[in-house]
Amino acid sequence: MASGAPQNSSQMACDGEIPGFLDTLLQDFPAPLSLESPLPWKVPGTVLGQEEVEAELTELAMGFLGSRNAPPAVAAAVTHEAISQLLQTDLSEFKRLPEQEEEEEEEEERVLTTLLDAKGLSRSFFNCLWEVCSQWQKRVPLTAQAPQRKWLVSIHAIRNTRRKMEDRHVSLPAFNHLFGLSDSVHRAYFAVFDGHGGVDAARYASVHVHTNASHQPELLTDPAAALKEAFRHTDQMFLQKAKRERLQSGTTGVCALITGAALHVAWLGDSQVILVQQGQVVKLMEPHKPERQDEKSRIEALGGFVSLMDCWRVNGTLAVSRAIGDVFQKPYVSGEADAASRELTGLEDYLLLACDGFFDVVPHHEIPGLVHGHLLRQKGSGMHVAEELVAVARDRGSHDNITVMVVFLRDPLELLEGGGQGAGGAQADVGSQDLSTGLSELEINTSQRS
């Protein structure tokens, strides 16, 4: 799910945009899939836990429709309707019996969850998707044409010198459309996940955190609390999957949910988000690292230890103190996120979310100058600013995967007119309220308006 800069007005789907897309799609797929038909998109594994179905099939549909150049709001609305229809049906025909090996495990070790056949479920879902598209070709519901704020988001990610790309990111401007929220508050969600020990945990988090957030009762009243709980619940879900499939990976993560004139962020580990306002860095969060005294004390109180090797590590292994996954390092590596909220005044320039492959070599105070310099050279275009920031980190010696996402909160041309360069090393820590609250292997560059 990728996309993009807010304008002063909302965006509504053009009169012919939705029917035109549906006409083209249904020309290529004129009938539901038969049992012999190949699936048009990759299936998410061989089995799914019942609680995983909504998020995994949502990801499948958004990937498929995005590959067909569906407008993001249209893809989200169609996906939501198809998911809603599927979840009202009896899914018991897709139940899979446990493997013999799992049956023989000790009772206390057994992962008790209903497993469903992913391929059969995906085929049934594609046919729900086809049915919705056929219905909407005749008449598009008004809910699918609801206004959506326009965004400019610049994203760039590289594998760098690492053997595998373990980062994942999410850019979801059509949050309301995807989850059927019909109130007057515009919502957009952005996230970066930095995996380690494999990509499974990062991919899982990029699929499930926002879906879990959408189901939290606090989403409408306390969005930061909803994000915090979404991280915790996603960690619990992934730990079940990890035990079932013998996965050992983990992921840090950071996300931002913009709800009208408010910003809510949540984070786990050392991925970070900063806000730049009138050329000044506004500190929103403190990353979780083993060397932080409070983190070190928490780990030691649980019976673990923090040691300095090439860097500070938990129990001599992991260089992060909080993460989704890392099943064999729980509870020392915590799955409890922190969160914060702040009101937006309209003077904010942009958000920047990135993994430690960027922030380890590019200090916060340099970012406004780097972005401003890019905008000057590009005459106010911010489309490729993330690519330049990634290049800066790589040239400074970062060997890690690098992902950078810049979410503009004002038109980049306005930032040039206002001289948003920042004052050297100035950094503000303004009013943050702490609350209890598909990639290519080598590189991805996504910069678009939506």
UniProtKB/Swiss-Prot annotation:
The keyword Hydrolase applies. Its cofactor is Mg(2+); Mn(2+). One of its GO terms (cellular component) is perinuclear region of cytoplasm. Residues 433-450 have a biased composition (Polar residues). Binds 2 magnesium or manganese ions per subunit. GO terms for molecular function: calmodulin-dependent protein phosphatase activity; metal ion binding; phosphoprotein phosphatase activity; protein serine/threonine phosphatase activity; protein tyrosine/serine/threonine phosphatase activity. Keywords: Apoptosis, Hydrolase, Magnesium, Manganese, Metal-binding, Phosphoprotein, Protein phosphatase. Its EC number is 3.1.3.16. It is an enzyme of class 3 (hydrolase). Residues 152-409 form the PPM-type phosphatase domain. Residues 420-450 are annotated as: Disordered. Coiled coil: none annotated. InterPro entries: PP2C, PP2C_BS, PPM-type-like_dom_sf, PPM-type_phosphatase-like_dom. GO terms for biological process: apoptotic process; cellular response to xenobiotic stimulus; intracellular signal transduction; negative regulation of cell-cell adhesion mediated by cadherin; negative regulation of DNA-templated transcription; negative regulation of protein transport; positive regulation of cell migration; positive regulation of cell-substrate adhesion. Mn(2+) 2 binds at residues 194, 356, 400. The modification Phosphoserine is found at residue 450. The keyword RNA-binding does not apply. It catalyses: O-phospho-L-seryl-[protein] + H2O = L-seryl-[protein] + phosphate; O-phospho-L-threonyl-[protein] + H2O = L-threonyl-[protein] + phosphate. Dephosphorylates and concomitantly deactivates CaM-kinase II activated upon autophosphorylation, and CaM-kinases IV and I activated upon phosphorylation by CaM-kinase kinase. Promotes apoptosis. PANTHER family: PROTEIN PHOSPHATASE 1F, PROTEIN PHOSPHATASE 2C. Belongs to the PP2C family. Associates with FEM1B. This is Protein phosphatase 1F. It comes from Rattus norvegicus.
